[in-house]
Structure formats: C-alpha cells, structure tokens
C-alpha cells in the first residue's frame, strides 16, 4: 500500500525556501500541524520559587501525600511576542526583584519601557494563538491555577559535581576481593579493538552529574493558598530549595483543566 505523502511537508518548505518559492501552508488536518498545536499550551507559564516539601493526608484513601510548595514572588508579564512582528506568539514573564545597576542598558530599557522594576528571573513562554497573550504589567497570582488541575514543571536538578560511573550511571563495579586490584569502581571496557579504533558516542563514563534541565509532567495541583501566595503540587520537583521553576499547563489534553 502506497504512503499518503511521498514527501514530508518539512522537506517541501525547505526546498521552497532555498529555491525562493512560496512554501505550501501546513494543512489543518496534517499530522505535523496537529503535533504543533498539541505541544504549545493555550496560556503562558509562570516562574515560581520552590520553597520545600511537606505532606498531607488523602481523606479518601488514608494515604500520606508528598507535596511541594511553590511560591509566587512578584510574577509579572513583561512583554509579548506576536506572529506579525516576531513570527510566533509568546509572553515574556519575570519574577523576583533585581537591582537596576546589575543589568545591562538594553535590559533596563525593556523593563522601564513598560514601567516594570527589573526582575531576577525572566523567561519566554510560547502560547498557541493570540488569545493567550497577556498585556505587559499584568501580575500573576494564585488565582492563575485551580485545585485538581494538572501542570508541567521544569527545573534545574541539583548539581552533584564530578561523579564516577557507579554513582552516575549505577554500574555494579568490579569485585571487592578475589584478585581485584585498583579496579573496584572502574567502568571496565569502553569499546572494541582496532575496529572501530575509537570510543563510540554515547558511552557512559564518569563526568559531571546533575545540574540538568528536567521536566516533570502531569503533576496535580493539590491546593492553592492565596494568603501565603503559594500552591501545593503533588510529588517532587527537580532543583534545590529557593530555586526558580517554570510551571505551565500540561499539554496532555485529557488531564488539563484549561486545554
């Protein structure tokens, strides 16, 4: 049975770009268009501060539930990106506070042009269309999230420094005795012989462990506390306490309260 598409839409647009031709628009029913729509949330995300963990008891099951505390720290919309001017829709969001003398003149102009005090953390969040844009200066509060909705949280994991293969990758190591000498925690063989005469890419070795961007998806918002300006999210989140994390509506349509 022949395939429906002999050439992918991406290749068609690439060839059209180099040949100075008008590229064919992505049809609404193509898998590529559906994938692009699914990967971008309707609303922009926010930058929150991880304060630590606590627990609660589920009244229905009687089980203890681990919760992570995420606090709003002067989260505010700074600028917007439009498809007409920039080629995509996005909202620039900032949180915290920073001294003006510690940032560049260009950054100062970006903040002061919207009458916003400089922020410690700044990040762009893509949105699906113009309906998700937020006017600059808008302050995000705990009302932005509702209990029982699901979110995706991205953070920087804790740095562990230089680690060996046993700690970094879970290698079993060599024998503790019976002839083993100076090779108890070594990685062992790292490749073949004359062929291919090199170490293949992706080989697990010792190196820097941690301090990587990781995303935890489909976390349940357990509760919202407007007085303390924080939300409680079920489960753990990467990163140390007092670190900034990026919270967005989950892209999973079946579990999102807004999609």
UniProtKB/Swiss-Prot annotation:
Disulfide bonds: none annotated. Residues 1-15 form a transit peptide. SUPFAM superfamilies: Translation proteins. NCBIfam families: L3_bact (TIGR03625). PROSITE patterns: RIBOSOMAL_L3. This is Large ribosomal subunit protein uL3m. Residues 176-208 are annotated as: Disordered. Residues 176-197 have a biased composition (Polar residues).
């Amino acid at each position: 049975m022949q395939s429906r598409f002999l050439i992918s839409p991406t290749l068609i647009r690439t060839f059209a770009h180099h040949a100075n031709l008008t590229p064919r628009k992505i049809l609404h029913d193509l898998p590529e268009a559906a994938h692009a729509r699914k990967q971008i949330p309707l609303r922009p995300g926010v930058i929150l501060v991880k304060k630590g963990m606590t627990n609660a008891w589920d009244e229905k099951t009687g089980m203890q539930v681990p919760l992570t505390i995420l606090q709003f720290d002067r989260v505010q919309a700074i600028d917007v990106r439009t498809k007409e001017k920039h080629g995509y829709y996005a909202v620039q969001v900032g949180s915290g506070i920073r001294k003006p003398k510690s940032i560049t003149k260009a950054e100062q102009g970006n903040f002061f042009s919207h009458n916003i005090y400089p922020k410690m953390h700044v990040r762009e969040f893509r949105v699906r269309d113009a309906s998700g844009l937020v006017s600059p200066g808008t302050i995000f509060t705990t009302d932005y999230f509702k209990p029982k909705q699901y979110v995706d949280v991205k953070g920087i994991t804790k740095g562990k420094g230089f680690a060996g293969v046993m700690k970094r990758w879970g290698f079993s190591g060599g024998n503790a005795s019976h002839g083993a000498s100076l090779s108890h925690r070594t990685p062992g063989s790292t490749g073949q012989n004359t062929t291919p005469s090199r170490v293949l890419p992706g080989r697990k070795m010792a190196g820097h462990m941690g301090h990587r961007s990781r995303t935890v998806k489909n976390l349940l918002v357990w509760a919202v506390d407007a007085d303390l300006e924080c939300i409680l999210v079920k489960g753990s989140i990467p990163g140390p306490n007092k670190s900034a994390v990026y919270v967005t509506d989950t892209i999973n349509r079946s579990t999102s309260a807004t999609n």
